[in-house]
From Swiss-Prot:
Heterohexamer consisting of three BphA subunits and three BphE subunits. A ferredoxin (BphF) and a ferredoxin reductase (BphG) must be present to obtain activity. GO terms for biological process: 3-phenylpropionate catabolic process. InterPro entries: NTF2-like_dom_sf, Rng_hydr_dOase-bsu. Belongs to the bacterial ring-hydroxylating dioxygenase beta subunit family. GO terms for molecular function: biphenyl 2,3-dioxygenase activity. This is Biphenyl dioxygenase subunit beta. It holds the Pfam family Ring_hydroxyl_B. Gene3D superfamilies: 3.10.450.50.
């Protein structure tokens, strides 16, 4: 197993100063609208928010002793729950919106909650590193319930779309090391 990229296991670095209220509000509103798109199964509209160079990544998490903390998450070159590009995300969207994607037929009912949004401006104009906490509730069929909690580390760019931003990178760090869900057909 290769060593993971340092940003997977280190605490998100707080910006030296808080983002301005207007920028903070814009980004939080972006996340609320993004959650609404996903919860209303508007997957094609959500897909339009992804940059062409998107990297959508959810590493595996394992239980480690304190001295092995840097190995808690799988690395860039290791197995992952998701390691997606724009093209593979498009394939996932096509699958969940078709009649042949059995994992989502009938479709799940989801609720995305996003909070603790921390915005960090970068040296690149109109590009922001954003850390947020999430809870994703999913109900499927009659009794299947899944609850996922964790944090997302995103790179957002200002964009000429109706929400004002696009997602250039998303790293999803789940709090759980063992997933009891039947599948991971939803989007975080």
């Amino acid at each position: 197993m290769t060593n993971p990229s340092p940003h997977f296991f280190k605490t998100f670095e707080w910006p030296s100063k808080a983002a301005g209220l207007e920028l903070q509000n814009e980004i939080e509103q972006f996340y609320y609208r993004e959650a609404q798109l996903l919860d209303h199964r508007a997957y094609e509209a959500w897909f339009a928010l992804l940059d062409k160079d998107i990297h959508y990544f959810m590493p595996l998490r394992t239980n480690r002793m304190i001295r092995e903390g840097e190995l808690e998450y799988s690395g860039d070159q290791d197995l992952a729950h998701f390691d997606e590009t724009h093209e593979t995300m498009y394939g996932r969207i096509r699958k969940v919106t078709s009649d042949v994607g059995w994992a989502e037929n009938p479709p799940s009912r989801t609720r995305h909650l996003v909070s603790n949004v921390i915005v960090k401006e970068t040296a690149t104009p109109d590009t922001f590193e954003v850390n947020s906490a999430f809870i994703l509730y999913r109900n499927r069929l009659e009794r299947q319930v899944d609850i996922f909690a964790g944090e997302r580390r995103d790179v957002l760019r200002r964009a000429d779309n109706n929400l004002g931003f696009s997602i250039a990178k998303r790293t999803i760090l789940l709090d759980a090391s063992t997933l009891l869900s039947n599948n991971l057909s939803m989007f975080f």
